[in-house]
Each structure stands twice: as C-alpha cells, then as structure tokens.
Regions:
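Short, extreme N-terminal leader segments that mark the start of a protein/domain
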Residues: 1-41, 49
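Active-site helix-to-loop segments that bind/position phosphate- or nucleotide-bearing substrates
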Residues: 3-5, 11-12, 26, 59, ...
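Glycine/small-residue-rich interface belts in oligomeric ring/scaffold proteins
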Residues: 32, 36-85
Length: 271
C-alpha cells in the first residue's frame, strides 16, 4: 500500500531504476520504492525528471504535482485511462440524472457544513450551533445558498471577524495550498475509478478541468482548515508547507478501521 508523500525541494535529478525512484543531488543519492509512494511533489523548478520515471509513476498511479517558481502547486500528471471500463463509466457519467446530481450535491453541502460545525466545536466556538441550523434549512441543490452563509460565519469564527478569504495573508496562502493538494488527491482517485474530472455534479465551469473533484472534495476542506488553524502561520514557507503535506498522513476512523487521509478519500470516491 502506498503511503509516502515525497517532496523534492532542491536541485536534483529524478530517475527510475529497478522499481525505485532515484533522487540524485550534489550531496547524495536516495532511493524510494515506487510502491511506497502515494504523492510526489516537485516543488523546485530546478529538477530534471526522466520520461522512464514518469511512465512508471503513471503506471503505479502515483500522483505527481509540479510547483511553479513560487513553490505553489501549478499542474499535475494525470493518465488518460484510469480504469479498464472507463468508456462505459464515462457514458454513464454523461447520462447522470439531473435530480440525482442535485440530491447528491445537497448531501455533499450538508456534510461540508456538518464538518465545519465540528471544527468550531473543537475550538469551543458557539457559532457551531448556528451552522447546524443551516443544515436544517437546506433545500434541494442548496437553492438558498446555505453553503455560502455557513462559510462566512465559519471563517469569521475560526480566524476572526476581520478575516476575508480574499486577503493576501499567510492564512489564505496556507488554505489555498492545502486545498490544492486535496484537490489533486481527488483528481487521482476520480481518474483511477474511470471517470472524468471535468463533468461535475454542481460545479460547471467550462474552464475548470476539475469540476467533479471540486464537488467531491468539499466535505474534506475543514481538515485543511484545522491544520491551518493549529499552525496559525505568520509566514508561509517551507516549514509550513511540510506541515500541510503531513495532513495526507493523518489518520481517521472509517467503519471502525484506521485509515490515512489518502485512503479515506479513496474509500469515499468509491462509495
């Protein structure tokens, strides 16, 4: 079972040899068996990667994330085919019933708000009960935008009344970074299950390649929020990014069994 998150932060060459990712830099050579790797993040732009390695990573369904010169996630490696019956699944996805899509989206919003309420409860914030009230007011497809109202109450309670998601600050940098990583994990699982990330339940932006991922990840956003709240960043640099990545190895209970964050996403996407 893959479980490692490997982050490449400095000038190096990545190669493939006998089932291993080989990382060479001026100081050392390190090998990691590909079967152990769940996510590979290439944070530095001064990294060279062989085509042989990329092919093996794709075959083993390792999520590869490339960052820009500011070390922010920019793109990812996604296979054309993730399942032997993907053509059949895509046909079914295209034909998804509109009412069913709306019902599923309503449930996703309910779970997201519920998790946000649990986060506020963890920090003993009274607005938790207000968010639970929004769940009772939910309409089909969230026509009254309870999600938006809940978000405003939630973020102001969690990070202060002066906080805005539009601000350029370390907290938002950490949140956006974390959400990008979670989105990438969902992209991998959706593709691995043979579906298109472009065709969503609610999100329907013609310029967004990840509409379905944006839909399904919503209940998982609060886990990033907790990590950022506990971090309380006054800057967002290498140390803070590593802390965000550690979220992928956090453990959860599902049906009485302990699962990592990545495995929890895998189970969720298959359900």
């Amino acid at each position: 079972m893959s479980w490692r998150t490997v982050v490449i932060t400095k000038t190096s060459k990545l190669d493939y040899s006998m089932g291993h990712l080989v990382v060479r830099d001026v100081e050392s050579t390190v090998k990691v068996h590909i079967s152990e790797i769940s996510v590979l993040v290439i944070e530095s732009t001064a990294v060279s990667v062989t085509a042989a390695l990329l092919c093996e990573l794709i075959k083993k369904k390792v999520k590869v994330i490339f960052c820009d010169e500011k070390h922010n996630p920019l793109s990812e490696l996604t296979p054309y085919y993730g399942s032997h019956d993907c053509s059949l699944k895509i046909k079914r996805q295209i034909a998804w019933n509109e009412t069913v899509k709306q019902c599923v989206w309503t449930q996703i919003v309910a779970e997201k708000i519920k998790n946000q309420a649990k986060v506020l409860e963890i920090y003993k914030l009274p607005q938790s009960s207000m968010l639970m009230g929004y769940i009772d007011e939910l309409e089909l497809n969230d026509k009254s935008n309870r999600e938006g109202h809940a978000a405003k109450v939630y973020f102001n309670a969690l990070f202060g009344k002066s906080f805005s998601r539009n601000d350029e600050c370390p907290i938002n940098a950490a949140l956006n970074y974390g959400y990008s990583i979670v989105l990438s994990v969902f992209n991998r699982e959706i593709t691995a299950n043979g579906y298109l990330t472009q065709l969503g339940l609610f999100h329907d932006n013609m310029f967004n390649q990840y509409n379905l991922s944006c839909d399904l990840m919503e209940p998982f956003r609060p886990f990033v929020d907790i990590a950022v709240k506990d971090m309380n960043p006054h800057k967002f640099e290498k140390e803070e990014k590593i802390s965000i990545f550690n979220l992928l190895n956090d453990e959860f209970k599902i049906d009485g069994r302990t699962q990592t964050f990545i495995n929890a996403v895998k189970i969720y996407c298959k359900s």
